[in-house]
């Protein structure tokens, strides 16, 4: 079992990897239904079923609420079940043949929702406004990150880093020829959440150095190999902060896993104004903290919407839908 994020709060707004990820699946179950309709709970039950059958699976968590699931991928069946409401996976690739839609809103009792429209709309506006501020702060954090890059760039030998990355990449043994992109870390209402399951049973190499040196190293590594998994940066998803290739892992943070080797990019130069770089790095942290504060307020608004819909749900009907989905996946 491994845990990831396929959507993230970034300096570019909400960054979605679902469309690319789901194209490789044999079947995709798309769950419709708004807040409080039990999508995450249903997916957790599917994961529990997969575990009871001894099947390997992945949990895809929500960056807006890391206690909640956005998806579950049963790897041994190559089937994914995902939240299909905006801003998640919402498109249908091949209806019925590949993609199957289940609407959990069908379990709502409309008679219990009389007179709540204005309240719900006001709470949704409030949530939207909080997210607008979230992305303003993260956009500012991204600008400071690139300021930091520009400062550090003056003191590192970029050509030597790229040449070294090329030599490392040549020794890798890729699995297949596809490139998978995902997040092991996310910017969430409680701060940053990070999982390290992908490092289990891997030879872990810790990559050290200034932020720009690591960016250059991983950018070059990602260009030179297929058959790898790229761990993207939450703040700047156009760059990666780690790579898995077969039994080898190159990461900036090994978490609780002991690293087997270390690559210190500091040997390629650190002749830049460290005080200026540190100031920009601190500004990244500060602006991200402001974003996290707003994310928490957005989550509170979301939870207040759920509180309206949960009492109107017929969860026994959800259980019937669950049985249909389990039959579809497990037979």
Where would I find each of the regions flagged by the language model?
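N-terminal accessory targeting/assembly segments
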Residues: 1-56, 205
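N-terminal pre-Walker A segment at the start of P-loop NTPase domains
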Residues: 1-20, 155-196, 331
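Conserved nucleotide-sensing/catalytic segment adjacent to the nucleotide-binding pocket
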Residues: 2-13, 48-111, 119, 222-292
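Glycine-rich phosphate-binding P-loop
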Residues: 28-47, 190-224
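A cross-family "folded-core" feature that marks the main globular domain of proteins
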Residues: 31-32, 42-43, 50, 58-61, ...
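An accessory alpha-helical subdomain
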Residues: 119-172, 281-328
């Amino acid at each position: 079992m491994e845990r990831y994020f396929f959507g993230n709060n970034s300096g570019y707004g909400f960054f979605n990897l679902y469309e690319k990820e789901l194209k490789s699946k044999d079947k995709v179950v798309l769950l419709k239904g708004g807040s409080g309709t039990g999508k995450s709970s249903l997916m957790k039950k599917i994961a529990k079923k997969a575990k009871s059958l001894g099947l390997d699976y992945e949990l895809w968590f929500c960056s807006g609420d890391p206690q909640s699931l956005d998806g579950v991928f049963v790897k041994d069946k190559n089937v994914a079940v995902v939240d299909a409401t905006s801003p998640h996976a919402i498109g249908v690739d091949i209806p019925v043949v590949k993609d199957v839609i289940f609407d959990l809103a069908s379990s709502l009792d409309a008679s219990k929702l009389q007179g709540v429209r204005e309240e719900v709309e006001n709470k949704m506006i409030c949530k939207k406004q909080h997210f607008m501020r979230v992305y303003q702060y993260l956009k500012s954090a991204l600008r400071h990150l690139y300021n930091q890059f520009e400062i550090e760039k003056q003191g590192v030998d970029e050509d030597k880093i790229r040449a070294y990355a090329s030599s490392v990449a040549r020794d890798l043994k890729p699995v297949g020829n596809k490139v998978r992109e995902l997040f092991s870390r996310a910017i969430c209402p409680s701060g940053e959440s990070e999982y390290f399951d992908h490092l289990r049973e891997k030879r872990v190499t810790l990559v050290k150095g200034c932020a720009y040196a690591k960016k250059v190293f991983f950018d070059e590594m990602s260009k030179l190999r297929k058959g790898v998994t790229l761990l993207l940066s939450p703040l700047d998803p156009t760059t990666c902060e780690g790579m898995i290739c077969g039994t080898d892992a190159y990461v900036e943070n090994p978490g609780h896993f002991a690293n087997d080797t270390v690559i210190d990019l500091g040997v390629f130069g650190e002749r830049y104004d460290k005080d200026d770089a540190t100031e920009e790095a601190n500004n990244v942290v500060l602006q991200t903290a402001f974003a996290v504060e707003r994310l928490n307020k957005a989550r509170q608004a979301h939870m207040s919407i759920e509180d309206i819909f949960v009492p109107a749900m017929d969860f026994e009907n959800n259980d019937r839908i669950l049985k249909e989905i389990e039959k579809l996946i497990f037979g």
